[in-house]
């Protein structure tokens, strides 16, 4: 028996490898690995279909076409294994070797490898210190290359044209060597001594006079060093032999009708072989040089096309005019090897079908159609049928299953028991797009899905399809159950709040049952217990919504008291675990309350209870929403009576504004802005009154008087409960549709005054179509953009894995509450929840330690911190984590989806990327629901106090204007309101030019006006009184009178002047006609930027605080994540904004210098040290004033910040803070929650590298970009040897750049620019240590995350032997249980890890 098995080849063990190296291959190596030379272009014989000898499919070279059978048929079958047939020369072995045996073609003349020639920067050209053009001229036989100049005036490496060569030849025949073509280049490369060249170049670099020269040398040195370290030889860049791909990988398949389908590679190889053979023949015939040269050029082109078709010249096309797919094209792009076959594979044991709702399922179940289950579980069924003795062979089992006998169904029931399946809905934007369920067999052909998981899948039942996958091995089943079961994914990994929350009908039902109805039956009754209440309700004595009192315990362990509540809420109490206080249920349950209830349940009662609660809430919700019988009818849309009044008022206001404009008091831009504001406000007011009308009903009480009570209007209940619809949409149904946007994004100033109930006129309908169509078009575009952003994020963060428990970092970041305009947007507690404290957090009053250093901040600690009134907390952060590779658990903090400290091996980078990318797509798909109505907040024009107290001015300079108000004269001024004890209650920034309504230290009441300003223009104010004189304000040169077409009035606008010397300005003269002095001694001159509208007129006398000119701000466009998505991409790509503000690098005092070349000079003078000078382009408004004290990092002009400047001036933490805040701003605008730490992970990946400024004694070169840990390692090594360390500066790379410059070339090549990455890797002889996730997936290994982390891979189990030996276990069972044990142990270990 043993002997039989020896005949069959055992499958070779997949080679265990832990790194992969890419390098150039020498011609000898190619020949050594080849199994023979391909000499003929023939493929197969068209009659016999057998491969031609020495052709592209030759059986002698590549192996037999049929298993164990030679080509001529002399030897057949296994018994002749390993014999080489003497007749046809074919070895008798399995035919699968045709997938792995290489052939080769010996070229008659060398050719250059196109990758190293044309992939920029050209490596061959760099190495030879020539330009690419020059190298190409030599290669394509247009010029001679001097290899040895001898005693001639030529020099080595010079190019000679034909004529010049002939001339020189006449004069110095035989004294010099010059050739052309790839031979010339190869000989030149052969003569290079890499070691020597490296030394020479390093010397040249240190002596380089100019920066340009140094850069050029450095570029060349980089390539030389790569050769030096990798052991590659430069002449290998020129090919003398080319390998031929195994034939099975470039198949030739007969189609019916005698035609063949073939891989393009065969055509390309055939071309090479034909030209090569022709060249050989011509050389034998001693053909004229011209013909041979032409043939060599053609051979070069053929080889180029084989490696990378279309890279040089026109692409070679096939018979159907389509470019042939070369070897490079096989790797590149979405359809290439990397992305199509290695990163995304199709798998067996899977099926897909339409989904329908399964409301009676439990949360961990899904309904699987019997037909699908039968097909998916086939092998398991065969196994069980045999085990049960229903049949004896697999074949008979197969028959039984095909006939669908009754036993088969019984077995199927048993097989699927507790065998989880995975459901997936495309697009899978985050990890909750694939979850595991236990299947329940159902009739029909559609998969049933539990309604509560729809949010996570973003699924609905309008025809969506889902795929089912079956985990086979016991380990995969355990992982599926422990990690992916829907019941283990209650919290969202993006923000840590529950994602399994009832929605729509369920919410409506819960809302309906917890509402109060005035004067309902049984109101005011007092019941002795919950049981009595239930009896009374069942008997119909009390209504569901009656207000009653019940004696019950308000929370676990508290004594019973009378609680005022309603019937429905007490019924709901029975559903909710007793641990949860009744206060959480004793409210009207809208969507946010239900979400909060599930969150609290998870924290107090644990996972299992939460799952049960979710299911109970689902059932209760459906039951009561059915009983409520809520529907929609036309009369539910109540149009408020005051609509006409409000509309009239708005029309009057608009007419008034129009009149002001006609009289020339305001500009057209201001008029437009004000009109838009009036209508926006009018729409808001109508919406408000409509909502008030909807939310209150007037009913007659038993006493006979009319009372207003909360309404049971269906539409109002749907929106109020958060089940469906929003105030926005109701506004359009019953209020007014409001302002619409044009496709360009501007707002049309005539609003749609009608609503849908009244119906739209033709014009109104036409205006509406813009928005609706734009919504749909945007959606299509943005989905693609968002997907691409996610892909780049995943790629940059894929190797951010939790690798150690604690890196012992002593650094962290300071967290404060996030405020905007004095309003707290995000509380400090929300921002530090689940993070680790860096140092002890002390109570500011008692000094008691609230949180110890390195302790995780959970909900209870957050409460303590907030109650103590602490303003800022230092926490550990991913940004300051000191782990060399990956991130440590302590710096990362809580795993948001599990609610405890993150486990080792968690792939936090991918989770971060998904959390940021997923809402991007969500949001982009959500624009059109409101139907394109322009949502635009009326601009803030004033500040009101929120608390009573006293006003304090902080850092505020002001002057009194003609009306006696203080006018703010500086930027970053602030007003604070403090209470009697002097504690600050609120603080607001006030803009330059704001008029303050309250004097310092004056008392204010909440709601009183503090300051007001014009939001649409930025004023240029005078600080002192004086007479206005214009300077360089010449009509038609630097200023033009723009006549308004409508009003006929003109205004003076500053324009860009042609001459560089014109500087439009306003000067103030004193009574003696001299230039007045400002309080700080500077002359009173005000420069006017381009676009400013001059308000003052020449020789006018003005008082302090008067407006001299106004700079109009952009008219507002609607905010929408379109602005958002590109903004997020721009931030993560670290792009410089188009018009970025120049920022000061030091603290100091501002002064202005002389102008130069149309730029203005701003000097910043520090208290100690030398002043810095900045040049600001003319026509830009400078936002600082002479004598201002400014801090490092403050902008000197208008514009957005350039992140690279922030990094340079303020350092990494400030940069990270800026990026996190800016990204969050975009998402917050859309109401999307993302935890800061996800953005921090991405920012950490962007800041991984350092740019070398001074190389010291290290192996780095100046301007090299190296990984930070590599930089630190090398420095430690050099300092240890007593050398000088390198000096570097932190570098921020955008996510695309960062992905391409990762250590792993496999990961980079599969991302973008495949050829470029592989070219570079080959020259450097790069080694990929397979540390990230992507490279391991591509190489077909387990990923080094989760249970695949090395710590678990190398773990061994010690099983204690029991004392007495019981009955022996049958062998096969033993294996299975052992496997289960080890997997179970591994998963338990990972769970245990998290707990301690």
UniProtKB/Swiss-Prot annotation:
Q: Tell me the keywords, alphabetical order.
A: DNA-directed RNA polymerase, Magnesium, Metal-binding, Nucleotidyltransferase, Transcription, Transferase, Zinc
Protein name per its UniProtKB record = DNA-directed RNA polymerase subunit beta'
- Subunit details: The RNAP catalytic core consists of 2 alpha, 1 beta, 1 beta' and 1 omega subunit. When a sigma factor is associated with the core the holoenzyme is formed, which can initiate transcription.
Biological-process GO terms, alphabetical? DNA-templated transcription
Entry GO terms, CC: DNA-directed RNA polymerase complex
List, alphabetically, the Pfam families matched.
Answer: RNA_pol_Rpb1_1, RNA_pol_Rpb1_2, RNA_pol_Rpb1_3, RNA_pol_Rpb1_4, RNA_pol_Rpb1_5
Gene3D superfamilies listed in its UniProt record: 1.10.132.30, 1.10.150.390, 1.10.1790.20, 1.10.40.90, 2.40.40.20, 2.40.50.100, RNA polymerase II, clamp domain, RNA polymerase Rpb1, domain 3
The organism's place on the tree of life at top rank: Bacteria
**What's the cofactor?**
Mg(2+); Zn(2+)
Functional note:
DNA-dependent RNA polymerase catalyzes the transcription of DNA into RNA using the four ribonucleoside triphosphates as substrates.
Which is one GO molecular function term here? magnesium ion binding
Q: What class of enzyme is it?
A: transferase
Q: Where is the composition biased (Low complexity)?
A: 1379-1389
- Give the record's family classification: Belongs to the RNA polymerase beta' chain family.
High-level lineage = Bacteria, Pseudomonadati, Thermodesulfobacteriota, Desulfuromonadia, Desulfuromonadales
Q: What is its EC number?
A: 2.7.7.6
Where do the annotations place Zn(2+) 1 binding? 70, 72, 85, 88
Query: What is the originating organism of this protein?
Result: Syntrophotalea carbinolica (strain DSM 2380 / NBRC 103641 / GraBd1)
Instruction: Quote the record's binding site residues for Mg(2+).
Output: 460, 462, 464
Kindly list the positions annotated as binding Zn(2+) 2.
Answer: 807, 881, 888, 891
| This protein's record includes keyword Coiled coil | no
Catalyses which reaction(s): RNA(n) + a ribonucleoside 5'-triphosphate = RNA(n+1) + diphosphate
- Give the note describing cofactor binding and stoichiometry: Binds 1 Mg(2+) ion per subunit.
Give me the ranges of the annotated region Disordered: 1361-1396
**Which InterPro entries does the record associate with it?**
DNA-dir_RpoC_beta_prime (IPR045867), DNA-dir_RpoC_beta_prime_bact (IPR012754), RNA_pol_asu (IPR000722), RNA_pol_N (IPR006592), RNA_pol_Rpb1_1 (IPR007080), RNA_pol_Rpb1_3 (IPR007066), RNA_pol_Rpb1_3_sf (IPR042102), RNA_pol_Rpb1_4 (IPR007083)
